Amino acid sequence: MNCEATLTEMRYEAPETLDAAIGLIGAETGVAKVFAGGTDVLVQMHLDLIEPDLIVDVKNIAEMREVVEQDGSWRFGAAVTGKELMDNPEFNVAWPGVMDGVRLIGSVQVRGRATVGGNLCNASPAADSVPPMIAADAIASVVGPNGRREVPMA
């Protein structure tokens, strides 16, 4: 049996601030991927669908881990897992339809790792959390090297 593998160099960074993450992504001349739960990125890498030059793990960024009620609205970061949202009783009461969609994401094990932000960003037509977010008039706050913008789900 003949087995051959080609390894390419990949950097992994785990910044602690949003500005640091944006700086890393903005400075990368190759392919950069954001890593929150990893359930999509790792599968895509395993299947050789993507070969990132840089992985930026955002789980250490406080803003990406928050679930916050503010002025009658709720905000949760891109690194919040489905399980973490399910474990937040106040969010469950405020947004039962959104939580119905979150509960449809994968298995119990997947929800413990997968993020709702990743479910949205993956842009899969089968993303379970997207229809309830559209119905709830959710707005994504997208941040990158060119600043922040608010993007309605609808």
Name each region found by the language model.
Residues 1-154:
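C-terminal structural segment of proteins
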